[in-house]
Amino acid sequence: MRRFLGRAVVALPLGLVAGLAPARADWLPQTEPPRWSELRQRELPGEGWRFMEAMRNDQVEAAEYLRFPTAVGETVELEAGLLLRRSGQPDWTSRVLPMRAVCRDGRMERKAADGQWTPYPGRAGTAVKVRWICSQP
């Protein structure tokens, strides 16, 4: 899967251009399948999660979520959620990370433990997903 929420984890489309991008985004999140909905309710804390996408390959199965998008200047801050299970492992791992979409640049950043924003590795499709995120608040 694509890198999302950390070194050994998967990337969010999640994670979008508020006021700087066209009003129309070229991408929309997938509809959450019932299987992922049940797992999310069991594994991700709290309410308000929006399913973004899921993937599966020989090494990992994962789904990405976001919630609470809030425009802050030329960015959109949000919580990114990840459900992850590595091949051969019976248990799921969930992570919630503070992230932001840098609308003007079409990229994502992750908030480090010291409160500083650091670049988050992008992947194919990140910029279009950033446009969608930035159109939400």
What name fits each language-model region?
Residues 23-137:
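N-terminal secretory-pathway/extracellular module detecting exported/lumenal segments
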Residues 8-19:
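Bacterial N-terminal signal peptides
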Residues 1-4:
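Positively charged n-region of N-terminal signal peptides that target proteins for export
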